[in-house]
Amino acid sequence: MKIDANKEKALNAVLGQIEKQFGKGSIMKLGENRSMDVETISTGSLSLDVALGAGGLPMGRIVEIYGPESSGKTTLTLELIAAAQREGKVCAFIDAEHALDPIYAKKLGVDIDNLLCSQPDTGEQALEICDALTRSGAVDVIVVDSVAALTPKAEIEGEIGDSHMGLAARMMSQAMRKLAGNLKQTNTMLIFINQIRMKIGVMFGNPETTTGGNALKFYASVRLDIRRTGAIKERDEVVGNETRVKVVKNKIAAPFKQAEFQILYGQGINRTGELVDLGVAHKLVEKAGAWYSYKGDKIGQGRANAGKFLLDNPAIAEEIDTALRGMLLASVEPAVESEVGDENVDLETGEIF
């Protein structure tokens, strides 16, 4: 694009002045000296990484994971922390619910000796700790569990029954404004786990909403809705949950995609089962009757045995994983998406209700 010489001279002068006042990189052309690819960390589930479009959750952004109780929210974040630690990243867990189980975290592959953990007394304290860790530039992933447990100081110091209308929402709104810029500058991922509440008197549409006001919905680059859809049984014993995750909002790829996987009690996400299912679906793993085979070699009779074979042979599992990621994760184009979740939008008409 040809720019008038006088305009170009004036533009260069003002750009130089801005950089002198606010520092180099404070303003630049969108395609200049920027990493166009978003750095991501795997969620621990291949199907969810594919649904997110970029191969995982994005660094330098705010992420919200919400769902009913015992749906797998904390498990998903612990799987992500384990994946981040394997890449040499520093992680922190702000345990506002005071319910983190270190034994379970260790079973999922989390290095608990190097996981920073805080159990704050108030919501303000939790968010100040988040801000301090972010500004240090030394922490890569911060998880806050949960937004509903971030109780404002005024509410803690007051009496039960006192009205504190909008306090938590105001606190979250202020924190989002402060944190968003710092997270981008230091390339830190901040994950908020959230709970579901019911709106009173809703006759039409979805009565469900999340706690902490609307600020988090707007500032989050990715919002995940996680639900338990069924039980996994071995004979009469329940050994895990069938889980569905819906990408409600996505600023790094197309939103509204879904992923289904299994969470096994005491083990976390059933990765090998996913590899078998996706391998068969994309013709990497052959299935003949009950037998599964890979590159002509039989790997097991039945899905469970095929999964066990991959668990015992991590090199083959890694080979299938790499091949599937290469097939399913194309280059990501940033999506133009709504600032509200799909619970407020009619997908057919696009009307907000």
Swiss-Prot record:
CDD domains (alphabetical): RecA
Keywords, sorted A to Z: ATP-binding, Cytoplasm, DNA damage, DNA recombination, DNA repair, DNA-binding, Nucleotide-binding, SOS response
Entry keyword annotation includes ATP-binding: yes
Main location (coarse class): cytoplasm
Function of the molecule: Can catalyze the hydrolysis of ATP in the presence of single-stranded DNA, the ATP-dependent uptake of single-stranded DNA by duplex DNA, and the ATP-dependent hybridization of homologous single-stranded DNAs. It interacts with LexA causing its activation and leading to its autocatalytic cleavage.
Family: Belongs to the RecA family.
Protein name: Protein RecA
Gene: recA
